[in-house]
Amino acid sequence: MAYKVALVTDSTCDIPKEWLEKYEITVVPMTVIFGDQAYMDGRDITPLEFYERLKTDPHHPTTSQPTPEDFVKAYEKATESGAEEVLTIVISSQMSGTYDSAVRAAQMFEKSVQVLDSHNNSMGLGWQVIAAARTREAGGDLAAMMESAKKVSAKMVYYVALDTIEYLSKGGRIGGAVKFLDSILKVKPLIYVKPETGTVAPALPSRSRAGVLKSLYNEFFKHIDTSKPMHITILHNNAEKDAKAIEARVREEYSPLEIFTTIVTPILGVHTGPGAVAICGYAE
């Protein structure tokens, strides 16, 4: 379909491939680096390959954000079918310099580009992109698409149960959470994303994996309005069994409007490490 407004995001969005295709969303890949080997997220390495390597590779991986030129190429691709405007929604500017690259590219591009800071990542970003896409499907213009994304952003609830603090402390952009969690290394950390600032903060940790997964579930449903239709994603870093068990429980206890489980992009897995499980979503 020829849309008047093109949609662009980055590869931390974790949006299922079928939705990317259905809504014609252009994705700008980030890069994960092991030593001197660089891999484009979603193209050169799969999440499963990444998490297996993460456990054994002596090099702690790093990530590289897209350049402004990468975004210009994405804008060109996204507008090939005739779109006159572009809406770009990306990972929190407090977690990555991707937002700055997208803005610089917008200034370089010949057509109008609006860039939104999602104040989030993974499906905390992805649900915003999907909301904008569905508004476009319903006939909404750029302003309506932006408003839909912003409403979802403000309602987003996103908790992550970590199996270890090791990867988080090695190099994530998480502000004061590292200092707090470093003092309690022997526990299983629980963290969450603050949608108003786009930063990560610590919640109450647990002394066991079972305990932190229980806290993950309880904290998420404490902060979301379960009386309204809910859109939920269960995310995991190669911990599908635990994630699927949570999905089954959510379906039984709450019957959300939408729910699915997916593995997390390597770009975020660099910081959260193997075994992490998250619940992310919003209520209408």
Question: Where are these predicted regions, by residue range?
Answer:
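Mixed-charge interfacial surface used for oligomerization/domain docking
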Residues: 3, 12-20, 26, 31, ...
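Short beta-strand segments
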Residues: 8-9, 88-92, 116-117
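N-terminal glycine-rich anion-binding loop in soluble enzyme alpha/beta folds
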Residues: 5-65
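Generic beta-sheet signal
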Residues: 5, 84-88, 230-232
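Conserved beta-strand edge residues that scaffold enzyme active sites
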Residues: 34, 92-93, 120
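Class I S-adenosyl-L-methionine
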Residues: 38-88, 93-108
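Short beta->alpha junction loops
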Residues: 65, 117-119
